[in-house]
């Protein structure tokens, strides 16, 4: 790390607004299709092969993930389409995604998934979404239809077959459609070696940067629905832990939903509540949510999950423009000057004494990363490696090969060392030995 000025994060200055707007339009407008993310660094050398560890591996270029959504559904149940309209009902099902063309073999996909270089992009396509059940999110939690019970039984059967006994819940950001959410979840599942059960939550994003305000509104309306989903997963699945990966504006759903969940059970014994909900890793990747609101929510629910991770890129161009829209900084690119002395002290204590890890994601410490990157959690091989290690091993930053850095005022951050590929490889070997 360099000096303290590195972490004095500010909202993008007006003179840079034009550049940010152009960049965000490019982010929003390019590549409507999802292409297979770069191979995580740990999988590029051949030393670590998560696919080889999977006793139930199906050697196919098709991937199936579960989903929950409060988007309105149309069309036949075995080929459901989901539109932008908000729905108070939770719709549950499975989505089948194909990696590459229909002619791609497992041998092709395996080679592409364990190599650093690729000759061309590999597109992911949603072949079908099969809706299996729907339920009223406002109904009592004990009132479950036979179809909904079958859905949760299917999740439990998948967990029984899976090497990883945690359920990973992915929540997408703004400017997204159902297809993109399914493809992101599918490729994350794929790079776990298909060893993890992944469920994605598709909230009704308007699928357009120009309708960002609609996304903000729909994210807010989704909060109680998502909170109820967490209760349902705790009640009806046998997952060891329920882990959450919230990307960008997905934090506008997840952060207040966790706070609401804690408030709704404020009178209950915290030990019993933790055992009931079994929340594990909560990972906020480039969170697009008001910085102070994020901290207020965090203070409410921090005693619920095993751990909370906040990733920070001070140069994130997408969050810079979002900050101008909201007139306050975003949690993934925060301005500490917005905090009172008391709030600053709480952040210091949380980073040192509470289950909160703040990861410093910047081009100054991570080579070949775009300085304004918003998608780093899956687009950069170092960061995606760290995400996989964290979710697969429930490992803390030091165990994963990251290095601590302490600000002058006491806030503790974690960053990627120059020899991270070597450190992470050694970390994987240690963790595999310890977790046997």
Model feature map: region roles:
Residues 1-12:
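N-terminal secretory signal peptides that target proteins for export/translocation
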Residues 18-24:
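Sec-dependent N-terminal signal peptides
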Residues 26-29:
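C-terminal motif of bacterial Sec signal peptides marking the signal peptidase cleavage site
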Residues 35-142, 153, 161-162, 182-186, ...:
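Lipolytic serine-hydrolase domain surface
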Residues 166:
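Alpha/beta-hydrolase fold active-site loops
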Residues 169-173:
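The conserved beta1-alpha1 loop
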Residues 176-181:
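Short substrate-entry loop that stabilizes the transition state in hydrolases
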Residues 226, 246, 250, 254:
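Gly/Ala-rich beta-loop-alpha elbow adjacent to hydrolase catalytic centers
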């Amino acid at each position: 790390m360099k000096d303290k000025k590195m972490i004095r994060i500010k909202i993008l200055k007006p003179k840079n607004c034009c550049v940010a707007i152009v960049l965000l339009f490019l982010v929003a407008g390019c590549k409507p299709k999802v292409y297979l993310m770069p191979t995580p660094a740990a999988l590029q050398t051949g030393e670590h092969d998560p696919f080889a560890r999977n006793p139930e591996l199906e050697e196919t270029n098709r991937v199936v993930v579960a989903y929950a959504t409060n988007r309105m559904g149309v069309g036949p149940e075995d080929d459901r389409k989901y539109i932008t309209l908000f729905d108070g009902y939770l719709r549950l099902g499975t989505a089948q995604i194909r990696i590459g063309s229909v002619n791609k073999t497992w041998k092709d996909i395996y080679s592409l998934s364990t190599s650093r270089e690729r000759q061309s992009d590999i597109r992911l396509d949603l072949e079908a979404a099969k809706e299996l059940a729907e339920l009223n999110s406002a109904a009592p939690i004990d009132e479950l239809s036979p179809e909904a019970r079958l859905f949760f039984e299917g999740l439990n059967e998948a967990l029984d077959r899976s090497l990883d006994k945690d359920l990973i819940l992915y929540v997408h950001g703004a400017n997204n459609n159902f297809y993109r959410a399914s493809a992101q979840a599918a490729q994350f599942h794929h790079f776990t070696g298909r060893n993890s059960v992944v469920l994605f939550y598709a909230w009704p994003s308007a699928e357009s940067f120009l309708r960002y305000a609609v996304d903000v509104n729909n994210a807010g309306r989704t909060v109680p629905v998502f909170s109820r989903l967490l209760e349902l997963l705790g009640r009806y699945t046998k997952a060891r832990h329920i882990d959450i990966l919230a990307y960008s504006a997905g934090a506008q759903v997840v952060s207040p939903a966790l706070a609401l969940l804690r408030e709704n059970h404020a009178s209950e014994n915290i030990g019993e509540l933790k055992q009931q909900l079994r929340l594990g890793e909560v990972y906020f990747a480039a969170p697009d949510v008001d910085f102070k609101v994020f901290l207020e929510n965090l203070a409410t629910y921090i005693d619920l999950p095993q751990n909370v991770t906040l990733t920070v890129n001070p140069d994130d161009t997408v969050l810079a423009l979002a900050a101008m829209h909201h007139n306050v900084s975003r949690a993934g690119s925060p301005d500490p000057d917005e905090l009172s002395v008391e709030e600053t002290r709480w952040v210091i204590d949380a980073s040192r004494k509470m289950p909160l890890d703040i990861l410093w994601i910047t081009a100054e410490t991570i080579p070949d990363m775009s300085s304004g990157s918003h998608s780093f959690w899956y687009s950069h091989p170092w960061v995606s490696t760290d995400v996989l290690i964290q979710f697969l091993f429930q490992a803390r930053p030091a165990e994963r090969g990251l290095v601590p850095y302490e600000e002058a005022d006491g806030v503790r951050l974690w960053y990627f060392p120059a020899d991270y590929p070597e450190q992470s490889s050694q970390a994987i070997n240690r963790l595999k030995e310890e977790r046997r």
